[in-house]
Amino acid sequence: MPLDYLPAQHPQRAQLHNEIHARPPEALAAPVAIAHIVMWADAAQREASRAHLAALLRDQHQAMPDAHSTHLRANLGGFRLRWELHTEFVTWTFSVPLPADAWNQRAPAAATEAVPREWLSQLPGLCLCQLQLWVLPTREYDELPQLGELLREDSLVASSVAQGHGEVFTDFCVHADGSSRMVLLAGSMAPRRLGRLVQRLLEIETYRMAALLGLPAAREASSVLAFAERELAE
């Protein structure tokens, strides 16, 4: 159909419209361990993260990203990597499939244990968020006493998600390993739906922390404004 009846188009319309499809959620199968790290970075550190990514890919004999890549997904032996370059931060997400009996004896290892330790310790920028997430194909919390090894019961909170098809647990604590933690009981949730849910949880944690960066300045400004109000009242 000819489009000559349409008004003049913005030159970036198609690019902006397609941005929603640039980083789609990945289908996931439970059980799986996921680590999500957000590094707050300036322009130089964001470029350094690209070089840091290239070093990992080179060590794993993988193709290098091009100079303009802003996101990448790759299978790297024992783990899968998802890297995303944002305006003010860089996210690194690692996922490791777990065996079906991973919770039979004790809580499973974190996904970061599959990542080269020295390389991980040198991520460019400042760590704003480090979340460890375990996804399990069950809905029975009472059958998982090992959760006590991961989450503090005195601050444990839970919420029903995905219209009641799953439950997520967290304790809103930063643990000794520097990570916050979540456990998602996903039951028999379909892989694509599970992938969308996990991406939402990771984004909630990312932007919760990013939004709170302004809190110290807001508190400081609040005391200044309170003093100014008293001055005006006098």
Enumerate the predicted regions with their spans.
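Extended alpha-helical interaction modules
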Residues: 84, 95-234
